[in-house]
Amino acid sequence: MSELTQLAQQEKKQTYNFNKLQKRLRRNVGNAIADFGMIEDGDKVMVCLSGGKDSYTLLDILLNLQQSAPIKFDIVAVNLDQKQPGFPEHVLPEYLESIGVDYKIVQENTYGIVKEKIPEGKTTCSLCSRLRRGILYRTATELGATKIALGHHRDDMLATLFLNMFYGGKIKSMPPKLISDDGKQIVIRPLAYCKEKDIEKYAIAKEFPIIPCNLCGSQPNLQRQVVKEMLNTWDRQYPGRLETMFSAMQNITLSHMCDPKLFDFKGIKHGQLIDGIEGDTAFDEERITPMQFEDEDQTDFSNKEMINFKEVN
C-alpha cells in the first residue's frame, strides 16, 4: 500500500470519527434542550463565551442546531473581558466575526476587584462567580435575551454534586435549567448530557482558539480539582460509573432520603397507602441490570433522530 493511500485512509477514518463525535454531541444537546424545555420558539439565547473549550463547543453546536430546529430562535454570543493581564482581546472578536455570529464584548475589571478583595493563595471562585453572574444578568436584560446559556457539562454537574456533599452537607448539583432569584432571567445548560472528554476531543478537532483563565486555572489544589480527579479515576477504573451516577441524579426516591421538607414523614400513618411511594419493599435487595452505555467508537448514527431537533446535517 502506497504512502499516499495510507494517508487517504487515515484522513477518511479521522473524518468518520469526527462526524460520529459531532453527531453524538448534537444529539445530546438536542435531547437536553427537549427534556428540560430549554429553548422555545422566539427565544433569544445569550451564549456566554469564556474562550474555553466548553463554551466554544456550546456555541458551535447551538449554531448548528439553529439551522435545522423546528423552532426559530436567535443567538448572540457574549464575552466578559475581565481585564486579566495579558488577555488576548483580539482572539474572540476575530473568531466570532469569522463565523458570522452576533456578539458583544463586555469589559469589566472583575480581575482587579478579585485580586483586591481575595488574599493571595485563597480561592477566588466564589467572588468571581458572583461578579460575573451580576454582569451577565445585566447584559442579558440590555440585549433582550430570554435565555442565558452556560457551558457546564455532565462532569461539572457530577463534580458539583460531590462538592456539595463533601464540603457543604447538601445533596445539590447544577440544575440544567434555573430561574434567577428575581425571576427575570432563565439560565440553561445545554451541555448537561455531554461528557467532558467528548468536548475536549471536539475542541481539538475544531481547533478553537482556546484562552486560558488566569483567575482560576492557576490556583492549585482547588476542591473542585480534587473531586474532578476522583471522578476521572473512577471513570478509568470502572467504565460506566459516571453514567450510572448521572442517571441516579434523574431517579430520586424522596421517601427514602432524610429531608422532612421534601417528604412528609410525620404524616405517615398505619393503614395508609400512598401511590408512588416505595415502602419496605425498597429495602429488599434490588436486582440490578447492567446499564447499556453508548460505545463511543461503535455508535450507529444511521438514525439521526433527535427529540424535537430533527435531522442535523
Swiss-Prot record:
EC identifiers of the protein: 2.8.1.-
Domain of life: Bacteria
InterPro entries according to UniProt: Rossmann-like_a/b/a_fold, TilS/TtcA_N, tRNA_Cyd_32_2_STrfase, tRNA_thiolation_TtcA_Ctu1
Cofactor(s) required, per the database record: Mg(2+); [4Fe-4S] cluster
Pathway membership: tRNA modification
Pfam family, one: ATP_bind_3
Disulfide bridges in this chain: none
Keyword Glycosyltransferase: no
The UniProt record lists the keyword DNA-binding: no
Catalytic activity: cytidine(32) in tRNA + S-sulfanyl-L-cysteinyl-[cysteine desulfurase] + AH2 + ATP = 2-thiocytidine(32) in tRNA + L-cysteinyl-[cysteine desulfurase] + A + AMP + diphosphate + H(+)
One GO BP annotation of this record: tRNA thio-modification
Binding, [4Fe-4S] cluster: C125, C128, C216
Key words, A-Z: 4Fe-4S, ATP-binding, Cytoplasm, Iron, Iron-sulfur, Magnesium, Metal-binding, Nucleotide-binding, RNA-binding, Transferase, tRNA processing, tRNA-binding
Protein's cellular compartments: Cytoplasm
Single GO molecular function: tRNA binding
Motif (PP-loop motif): 50-55
Cofactor: record remark: Binds 1 [4Fe-4S] cluster per subunit. The cluster is chelated by three Cys residues, the fourth Fe has a free coordination site that may bind a sulfur atom transferred from the persulfide of IscS.
Any one GO CC term of the record: cytosol
Sequence similarity: Belongs to the TtcA family.
Record's function text: Catalyzes the ATP-dependent 2-thiolation of cytidine in position 32 of tRNA, to form 2-thiocytidine (s(2)C32). The sulfur atoms are provided by the cysteine/cysteine desulfurase (IscS) system.
Note: The thiolation reaction likely consists of two steps: a first activation step by ATP to form an adenylated intermediate of the target base of tRNA, and a second nucleophilic substitution step of the sulfur (S) atom supplied by the hydrosulfide attached to the Fe-S cluster.
Subunit description: Homodimer.
The protein's name: tRNA-cytidine(32) 2-sulfurtransferase
Native source species: Haemophilus influenzae (strain ATCC 51907 / DSM 11121 / KW20 / Rd)
